[in-house]
């Protein structure tokens, strides 16, 4: 980890120290000698770390890590950009979870939004239809939210599961669009749709969703 932000007694945690030439790749290499069942790499930043994580996965270890990308499909293209061969990506990546945080409306002062927002929301959600009642709200501002109109945050998630059909799109001439289309066909809910559902529930605003996705 870089740095260790929370001590977990049940885990064996190690902090990387680049000044001592002990980075994620070196830490992974040392960790492999301890025969772990599950490995968590704080972040994959370079090819060396990616290669070690891939090798750990190939030898039967369950590996978790993070990447800075725009969405779930972007994690696959990011690994390819780092230099990981497509056949190794297809062989080892099980799934990718993308996350965004959207501010939630203050329950003390939010008010119903107008019909225009309802119609715009339906357009944003296309080709999906929002189930249930659509109840968009807008921020106002009060003492409880310090006149911002927002209190707290809600997670927007996009889960990409690598099925056989999805893996088939991961080849040397990787087409991110083809992978995304296949994932959506198999039920992946894009970040923007996840946000639109939060708007329909009255938890956040369309502007906040569009800003974050």
Model-identified regions with their sequence ranges:
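Short, flexible helix-loop junctions that flank or precede catalytic/ligand sites
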Residues: 1-213
